[in-house]
């Protein structure tokens, strides 16, 4: 019985010590989550521009191996997917790049890639800022496969997708003997 009383007393003391800290924790509002998403898109844009500026213009056609996309094609794919996923998530009209920019040789110059990529990020930032939070829980049927996701999931998948393809281009830059940009996990380079 003495052990039980000591255990209960210890538990209550511990709980009373910890509870004030727990009760002061603040829940995130949907507006906070939306603001963080906008911040993440702004950071992702800056980070991707670092990548575009790091790769020399004459190396945009470089492929790590013949069977994969070139650096320019990776970035153009990223840009078109940004537009597709964010427009699907938000229903906000996106700029039209035409189809398969990554297969167009004229789109693969450094200046063209920079234009398409920055335009796509500007759209994503605007779409995130102007998305209707009250609709984030709605399910959307994807126009391929048999997939259905919430708008919020699509917003997150858009961020995930661009990070994946930007990350793939790290090896392209390294194979040129160039150090890739510092990570911008918390804003500036780390």
Where are these regions (language model features)?
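Short N-terminal segments immediately surrounding and downstream of signal-peptide cleavage
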Residues: 23-46
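Bacterial Sec-dependent N-terminal signal peptides
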Residues: 1-28
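Residues within well-ordered alpha-helical secondary structure of globular protein domains
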Residues: 54, 77-80, 119
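Short, contiguous alpha-helical
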Residues: 38-42, 46-49, 59-102, 142-190
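Acidic/histidine-rich, surface-exposed loop or edge segments in extracytoplasmic proteins
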Residues: 25-32, 92-106
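Acidic/histidine-rich alpha-helical segments that form the ligand environment
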Residues: 105-142, 149-162
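Surface-exposed helix-capping loop/turn segments at secondary-structure junctions
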Residues: 54-61, 128-137, 175-180
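Well-ordered alpha-helical scaffold segments within catalytic/enzyme domains
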Residues: 47, 51-52, 86, 123, ...
């Amino acid at each position: 019985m003495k052990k039980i009383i000591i255990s209960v007393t210890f538990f209550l003391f511990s709980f009373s010590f910890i509870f004030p800290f727990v009760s002061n924790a603040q829940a995130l509002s949907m507006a906070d989550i939306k603001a963080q998403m906008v911040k993440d898109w702004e950071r992702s844009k800056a980070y991707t521009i670092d990548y575009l500026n790091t790769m020399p213009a004459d190396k945009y056609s470089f492929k790590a191996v013949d069977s994969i996309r070139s650096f320019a094609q990776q970035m153009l794919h990223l840009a078109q997917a940004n537009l597709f996923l964010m427009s699907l998530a938000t229903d906000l009209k996106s700029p039209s790049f035409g189809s398969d920019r990554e297969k167009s040789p004229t789109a693969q110059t450094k200046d063209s890639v920079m234009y398409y990529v920055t335009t796509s990020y500007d759209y994503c930032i605007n779409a995130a800022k102007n998305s209707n939070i009250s609709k984030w829980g709605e399910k959307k049927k994807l126009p391929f496969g048999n997939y259905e996701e919430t708008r919020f999931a699509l917003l997150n998948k858009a961020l995930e997708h661009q990070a994946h393809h930007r990350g793939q281009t790290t090896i392209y830059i390294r194979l040129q003997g160039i150090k890739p940009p510092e990570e911008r996990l918390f804003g500036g380079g780390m």
